[in-house]
Amino acid sequence: MHHDLVDVLIIEDESELARLHAELVQKHPRLRLAGMAASLAQARQLLHATPPQLVLLDNYLPDGKGVTLMT
């Protein structure tokens, strides 16, 4: 059985936490890191350019609450 990779976008403004999430994603055999964003503005650009299948979303970002991306 063939399984496609799941594209993951990490939205996190704390660089050390973002790096840790990225390492975990890259180590998982079924996940692929699609991108990383440290703000809502960056996240919106990435979401439109390459929509991921999974998002790891920080709710407290420098330019607003992450949950607003879901509306």
Predicted regions and their residues:
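Charged docking surfaces used in two-component/phosphorelay signaling
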Residues: R19-E23
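Acidic, metal-coordinating helix/loop segments flanking the phosphotransfer/catalytic sites
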Residues: M36-L54
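Active-site residues of response regulator receiver
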Residues: D58-N59
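Non-catalytic signal-transmission and effector/linker regions of two-component phosphorelay proteins
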Residues: M1-D7
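Conserved Rossmann-like nucleotide-cofactor binding loop
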Residues: E16
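Conserved acidic carboxylate
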Residues: E12
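The feature encodes the CheY-like receiver
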Residues: P62
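Acidic catalytic/metal-coordinating carboxylates
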Residues: S39, K65-T68
